[in-house]
């Protein structure tokens, strides 16, 4: 392990998440307060919580992130694009969309590109107030794909305008692995972000993902990861 980061430096890699169906308003408010204190990169919540989180974080450097087509990716592209634009208009700075997993498994590059492009165009469009768009992360759900399909999904995401590729929703059969992060980094090169999400629970887990090429970490256990230098 050659990566060495202070707690403050590591915090800037982390999207602190609360994405379970039973997440309450009290849970969200607690996550926001803890995330502000820790100085993480973003708070990632389901779209229903975007207005609250964006308002609570308005005077901080912590960004508001939400999820699109989550967790299955089985919505139509039009629905995903609408969901993304609605979330951005409500205050989201970043959106994490789930790909059409079936298209990736079938090797259908054109369908993948079309799906991601619809959301990329919605995410990157200037809003009605002229306040710009949002960063787009594309979840490929690595646990459901072989290596060839992971490469295809990452290539399609980049072609379609993604800013990041992301390993997992955290709601499938497995989460991020060092091997998949490294494969995704090799595939997209240095100009695109790579987010490791799902099963990253300790500081050692996070540093291993960063060593493999991750530039963002999604974690529901952000405070545990940041617990000590």
Swiss-Prot record:
Function: Catalyzes a reversible aldol reaction between acetaldehyde and D-glyceraldehyde 3-phosphate to generate 2-deoxy-D-ribose 5-phosphate.
SUPFAM superfamilies, sorted: Aldolase
BP-aspect Gene Ontology terms: 2-deoxyribose 1-phosphate catabolic process; carbohydrate catabolic process; deoxyribonucleotide catabolic process
InterPro entries: Aldolase_TIM, DeoC, DeoC/FbaB/LacD_aldolase, DeoC_typeI
Domain of life: Bacteria
Pathway(s) this gene product operates in, as recorded in its UniProt entry: Carbohydrate degradation; 2-deoxy-D-ribose 1-phosphate degradation; D-glyceraldehyde 3-phosphate and acetaldehyde from 2-deoxy-alpha-D-ribose 1-phosphate: step 2/2
Catalysed reactions listed for this entry: 2-deoxy-D-ribose 5-phosphate = D-glyceraldehyde 3-phosphate + acetaldehyde
Assigned protein family: Belongs to the DeoC/FbaB aldolase family. DeoC type 1 subfamily.
A GO MF label: deoxyribose-phosphate aldolase activity
UniProtKB keywords: Cytoplasm, Lyase, Schiff base
Entry protein name: Deoxyribose-phosphate aldolase
EC number: 4.1.2.4
GO cellular component, one term: cytoplasm
Catalytic residue list: 96 (proton donor/acceptor), 166 (schiff-base intermediate with acetaldehyde), 195 (proton donor/acceptor)
Location relative to the cell: Cytoplasm
């Amino acid at each position: 392990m050659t990566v060495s980061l202070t707690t403050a430096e590591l915090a800037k890699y982390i999207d602190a998440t609360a994405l379970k169906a039973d997440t309450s308003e009290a849970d969200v408010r607690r996550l926001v307060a803890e995330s502000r204190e820790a100085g993480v990169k973003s708070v990632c919540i389901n779209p229903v919580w975007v207005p609250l989180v964006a308002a609570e974080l308005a005077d901080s450097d912590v960004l508001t992130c939400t999820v699109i087509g989550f967790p299955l990716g089985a919505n139509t592209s039009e629905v995903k694009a609408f969901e993304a634009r609605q979330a951005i208009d409500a205050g989201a700075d970043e959106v994490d969309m789930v790909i059409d997993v079936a298209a990736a498994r079938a090797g259908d590059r054109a369908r993948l590109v079309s799906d991601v492009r619809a959301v990329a165009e919605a995410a990157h469009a200037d809003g009605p107030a002229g306040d710009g768009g949002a960063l787009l992360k594309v979840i490929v759900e690595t646990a459901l794909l072989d290596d060839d399909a992971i490469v295809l999904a990452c290539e399609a995401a980049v072609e379609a305008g993604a800013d990041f590729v992301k390993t997992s929703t955290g709601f499938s059969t497995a989460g991020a692995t060092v091997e998949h992060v490294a494969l995704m980094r090799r595939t997209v090169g240095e100009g695109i972000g790579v987010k490791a999400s799902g099963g990253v629970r300790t500081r050692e887990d996070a540093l291993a993902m960063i060593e493999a090429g991750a530039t963002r970490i999604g974690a529901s256990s952000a405070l545990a990861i940041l617990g000590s230098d």
